[in-house]
Amino acid sequence: VEDDPMIGKSVQQGLRQDGHTVDWVRESRAAELALATTSYEMLLLDLGLPGKSGLELLAQLRRAAHRIPVLVITARDSVADRILGLDSGADDYLVKPFDLDELGARMRAVLRRHAGRADPVIALGDLRMNPATHEVTRNGQPIVLSAREFALLQALLEQPGVPLSRARLEERLYGWGEEVESNAIEVYIHSLRRKLGAESIRNIRGVGYLVPASQ
């Protein structure tokens, strides 16, 4: 959530190049709508937003027991501002200007801390997925997936036995405004089957894709 177009665009592009799916909004109301309709791993939040401030949005989320990790990104660099942000529920605080590599490192650190608060592992048969560390194993052997292969597999594993439509999967893999090739989902499904086994993902014709509830 960033109202500065130069910062917002550069962060969005940098994170997408690192394999993240990123939605960028410019004010709190749009952020509220996005959070109400989409599941996110993390919120990057500027404090100096038009209308409702970032601090007000953060406090509102925490009052509603929203547990999404929040990394505050702001030009406010006084000790008092940092304390206020952290006390309002931020997980970390990064002062502008910043390096994108440092942003990525802080994001990973926040996600690791959140992963330690509960068992994040998704398990189905001999398949194990850790969304916090982006690790996948089968029979204890690591499986290397791209960021979008991981996101697609995670969406399917979260609802085993339930077919998900192509449109639903595209929502998980791509941010708002990103161009989606017509056969993108099929390409990622083919790659996942090659790595996990032909029967690991099934196609329910006219409905969507699913992972069997038992593997």
Spans of features found by a protein language model:
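Glycine-rich nucleotide-binding loop
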Residues: 30, 206-210
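Residue-level preference for short helical/loop micro-motifs built around acidic side chains
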Residues: 9, 56-59, 171, 203, ...
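N-terminal/domain-start alpha-helical segments
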Residues: 1-114
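The C-terminal output helix
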Residues: 109-121, 161
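Short boundary/linker motifs that mark transitions into or out of structured domains
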Residues: 125-135, 207, 215
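Positively charged, aromatic-enriched patches within helix-turn-helix-type DNA-binding elements
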Residues: 135, 140-200, 205-207
